Amino acid sequence: MVNAIEAFDAKHMKPAEEIPAFRPGDTVEVNVKIKEGNNSRIQAFTGVVIARQGGGVRETFVVRKISFGTGVERRFPLHSPAIDSIKVVRKGRVRRAKLYYLRNLRGKAARIVERRDNSEK
C-alpha cells in the first residue's frame, strides 16, 4: 500500500529542475494555464510568497499581491500541471516561515528587505 502511494507521488511530481528554489519573503511570478472554453492562455500572478506548506506531491505555497488597493492571495499546488512556470523576481529577507502578519500591514510597512547573496561573486 505504501509503495503504491509513493509510486503515485513520484509519477505526479515535477522534476526538481522545473521548480526554482524559493522561500517565504521572495517575490515570484507564477504563470498559470487558464482554460476558457476551447482555448487556453497563460496568466501571470506576481506577488510575495507568504507561506509554504506540506511536502512531496501535496506541497503548496501562498502568494499575496495588492491588486487595485485590495489584497489578493492565491494558493498554488507546487506540482500542479496548471502551473506553467515559476520565476523568482526578487529574494526577500524575513525571519518567519509564515508571513500572515503582512495581511494587516499597508504601504511601506508591508515592504520586505531584499536578501543579498554573497555567493554570486
Swiss-Prot record:
Keyword Membrane attributed: no
GO biological process: translation
HAMAP family linked: Ribosomal_bL19 (MF_00402)
Function: This protein is located at the 30S-50S ribosomal subunit interface and may play a role in the structure and function of the aminoacyl-tRNA binding site.
Keyword list, A-Z: Ribonucleoprotein, Ribosomal protein
UniProt protein name: Large ribosomal subunit protein bL19
UniProt GO cellular component terms: cytosolic large ribosomal subunit
UniProt key word Ligase: no
InterPro entries, per the entry: Ribosomal_bL19, Ribosomal_bL19_CS, Ribosomal_bL19_sf, Translation_prot_SH3-like_sf
Residues forming coiled coils: none
GO molecular function: structural constituent of ribosome
Highest taxon, organism lineage: Bacteria
S-S bonds: none
Species, as recorded: Bifidobacterium adolescentis (strain ATCC 15703 / DSM 20083 / NCTC 11814 / E194a)
Entry similarity comment: Belongs to the bacterial ribosomal protein bL19 family.
